[in-house]
């Protein structure tokens, strides 16, 4: 397939409104693709170049991309950036920008999908002092060989957001329709392979190609997620008894071991082995089996109590000074699930069976404590214990649940203190991406400090597409400054925002940040003078610390 045909396909899909129409349109194309093009087409369609688990990363930021496009157009990068600021969509802006320039280099070639993929592979492989130059040269060649229309989708692909409204579920169902297999079979294969491109290749073989698949070390699996909102009585009523574990204030990890080699992956499936060597060493010595384990890394303070999760997160992101950081902060793994052992895939076993295998695999030192309980009173007591020890709450797990990679469902439920809310004024925003490209995607919030607004946090979660349009209408005439992707508003609109925790943070002028901020509503009934003050925010922060130290007041 030529990239020009891929771009036309994207445009046709972008113009579609219905998911079923999109699914069918994709399913018609798939059987015509070669074995080489099929996985590339699938990944590109989802705005990806490499599988999520792949160590290959493109490493191209907007500035380098804009520099390459400006060179092809024979003009300055600032002119392109100005156009992007006005449109809010880099792909459309680049198309318009190149269309207005006479550039004889266009169409010297009509690259195929495979050629574009090969160029991206060269970019990902570039390293050393000349890597930036090498990447720029490849980008120039790519954009010099496509039309302005094709450049729209090439730019979006490189930036990782195709903006055509295609999700994993649509592609999954299109694969099923194209090759006459069940969507559930495609989903199961996706859970094992974590790459819909490879799943499509397997599906070409029919049902036989999708069965007997197994997960394997060093190919990370999306992590199963928990949902909030379900109560303790509801879980017990549904399941009779549940496994109850502490909900740790740490960072999720996946541990892979084969022989004497181990690797650790973050929730984003990025390898972080070198950043947290003590975790790998601990678990490597804890088992002789080849395994894939799921758990949480927590940081422990000198008093034996857990430290905030940002402490662990900083370690996960660290590239240098690992030895010194290791001396300063104690990291401990808490393992609560096992997905694979000695060649056997375990995700289709019930949780209680996986737990029994896990207990026999790593021993008690790093095993997350668990109790199987059947009464709300017993769960309440464990919840109190978790809070008193400085944890976030408890996890309730269905003993019969299978491991569903990447799924947030009712089989795992987190019980935490009720979410508090703050009233904060909106002082700025960032333009959105994807479906939010022509609206504001996230909003900057502030509290009041002696007549001065101090930034506290950004919020993007909890806002529906309809609300985004309403908020755009509300704010569009209140823009007082714009720079790059950010705008500044007159501080007149108040948001009520829920949050899980107030945290110390140098990232915002107030000195605080909100963990898991979520939009609740616009407070039209409040004046700006009534918003949260820095003093009251500090009071909330200190009270929150007191609760964590063993005097909690909460509602179950």
From Swiss-Prot:
Enzyme Commission number(s) of this protein: 6.5.1.1
Reaction catalysed by this enzyme: ATP + (deoxyribonucleotide)n-3'-hydroxyl + 5'-phospho-(deoxyribonucleotide)m = (deoxyribonucleotide)n+m + AMP + diphosphate
CDD domains reported in the protein's UniProt record: Adenylation_DNA_ligase_Arch_LigB (cd07901), OBF_DNA_ligase_Arch_LigB (cd07972)
Top-level EC class as recorded in UniProt: ligase
Nucleotide-binding found in the keyword field: yes
Membership in a protein family: Belongs to the ATP-dependent DNA ligase family.
Binding of ATP, residues: 245, 252, 267, 296, 336, 408, 414
GO molecular function: ATP binding; DNA binding; DNA ligase (ATP) activity; metal ion binding
Signal peptide location: none
PANTHER family from the UniProt entry: DNA LIGASE, DNA LIGASE 1/3 FAMILY MEMBER
Protein name per UniProt: DNA ligase
An annotated GO BP: cell division
Recorded coiled-coil stretches: none
Function: DNA ligase that seals nicks in double-stranded DNA during DNA replication, DNA recombination and DNA repair.
Alphabetical keyword list: ATP-binding, Cell cycle, Cell division, DNA damage, DNA recombination, DNA repair, DNA replication, Ligase, Magnesium, Metal-binding, Nucleotide-binding
Annotated PROSITE patterns: DNA_LIGASE_A3 (PS50160)
């Amino acid at each position: 397939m030529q990239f020009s045909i891929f771009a036309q396909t994207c445009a046709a899909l972008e113009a579609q409104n219905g998911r079923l129409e999109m699914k069918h349109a994709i399913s018609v194309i798939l059987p015509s693709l070669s074995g080489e093009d099929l996985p590339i087409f699938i990944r590109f369609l989802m705005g990806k170049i490499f599988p999520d688990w792949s160590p290959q990363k493109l490493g191209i930021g907007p500035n380098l991309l804009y520099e390459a496009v400006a060179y092809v157009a024979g003009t300055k990068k600032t002119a392109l950036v100005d156009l992007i600021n006005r449109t809010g969509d880099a792909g459309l802006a680049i198309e318009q920008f190149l269309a207005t320039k006479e550039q004889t280099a266009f169409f010297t070639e009509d690259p195929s999908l495979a050629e574009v993929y090969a160029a991206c592979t060269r970019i990902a492989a570039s390293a050393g002092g000349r890597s930036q130059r090498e990447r720029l040269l490849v980008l120039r060649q790519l954009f010099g060989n496509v039309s302005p229309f094709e450049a729209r989708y090439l730019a979006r692909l490189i930036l990782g957001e195709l903006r055509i409204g295609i999700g994993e579920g649509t592609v999954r169902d299109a694969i099923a329709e194209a090759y006459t297999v069940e969507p559930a079979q495609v989903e199961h294969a996706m859970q094992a392979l974590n790459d819909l491109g490879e799943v499509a290749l397997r599906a070409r073989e029919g049902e036989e190609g999708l069965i007997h698949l197994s997960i394997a070390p060093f190919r990370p699996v999306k992590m199963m997620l928990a949902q909030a909102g379900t109560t303790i009585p509801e879980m017990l009523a549904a399941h009779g008894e549940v496994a109850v574990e502490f909900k740790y204030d740490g960072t999720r990890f996946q541990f892979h071991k084969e022989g004497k080699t181990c690797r650790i992956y973050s929730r984003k499936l990025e390898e972080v082995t070198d950043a947290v060597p003590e975790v790998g060493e601990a678990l490597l010595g804890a088992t002789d089996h080849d395994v894939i384990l799921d758990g949480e890394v927590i940081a422990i303070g000198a008093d034996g109590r857990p430290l905030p999760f940002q402490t662990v997160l900083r370690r996960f992101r660290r590239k240098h000074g690992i030895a010194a950081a290791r001396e300063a902060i104690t990291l401990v793994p808490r393992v609560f699930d096992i997905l694979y052992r000695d060649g056997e895939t375990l995700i289709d076993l019930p949780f209680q069976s996986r737990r029994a295998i896990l207990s026999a695999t790593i021993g008690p030192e790093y095993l997350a404590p668990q109790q199987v309980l059947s009464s709300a009173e017993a769960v309440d007591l464990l919840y109190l214990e978790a809070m008193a020890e400085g944890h976030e709450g408890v996890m309730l797990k269905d003993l019969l649940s299978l491991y569903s990679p990447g799924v947030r469902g009712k089989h795992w439920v987190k019980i935490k203190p009720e979410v508090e809310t703050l009233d904060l004024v909106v002082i700025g925003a960032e333009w959105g991406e994807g479906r939010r490209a022509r609206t504001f995607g996230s909003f900057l919030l502030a509290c009041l400090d002696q007549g001065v607004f101090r930034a506290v946090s950004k919020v993007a979660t909890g806002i529906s597409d309809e609300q985004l349009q309403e908020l755009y209408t509300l704010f569009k005439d209140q823009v007082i400054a714009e720079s790059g992707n950010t705008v500044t508003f007159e501080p007149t609109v108040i948001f009520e925002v829920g949050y899980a925790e107030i945290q110390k943070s140098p990232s915002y002028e107030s000195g605080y940040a909100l963990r898991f901020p979520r939009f609740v509503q616009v407070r039209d009934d409040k004046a700006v003078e009534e918003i949260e003050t820095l003093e009251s925010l500090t009071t909330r922060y200190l009270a929150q610390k007191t609760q964590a130290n063993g005097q909690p007041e909460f509602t179950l």
